């Protein structure tokens, strides 16, 4: 079962959207997560490398369950890296660590 705090990919319908983020709550009424549209992920990741240039960020969003098509854990698939792994490789910090302290120094 996917638990709050997990890094997830949320697929929505009407309109179709995909988000990367941290699951906060999954309930009968819907899903709450702190995330960013996947179309902005690479820009957000590039911005995380330059801490003084913060124009993109994750937003806390509630989506009614009728819009949720599926929720995936952000996991690697064979040789394809997860979004979290890509983030850590480019930024030098884990996603959870970055979200707790965006201006901190890289750990790598």
Give the predicted meaning of each segment.
Residues 1-108:
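Conserved RNA-binding domains used in RNP assembly and mRNA/RNA metabolism
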């Amino acid at each position: 079962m996917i638990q709050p705090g997990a890094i997830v990919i949320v697929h929505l319908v009407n309109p179709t959207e995909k988000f990367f983020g941290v699951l906060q709550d999954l309930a009968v009424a819907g899903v709450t997560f702190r995330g960013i549209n996947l179309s902005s992920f690479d820009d957000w990741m590039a911005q995380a490398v330059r801490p003084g240039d913060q124009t993109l960020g994750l937003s806390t969003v509630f989506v009614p369950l009728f819009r949720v098509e599926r929720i995936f854990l952000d996991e690697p698939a064979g040789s394809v890296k997860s979004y979290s792994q890509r983030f850590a490789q480019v930024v030098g910090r884990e996603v959870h660590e970055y979200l707790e302290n965006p201006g901190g120094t890289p750990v790598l």
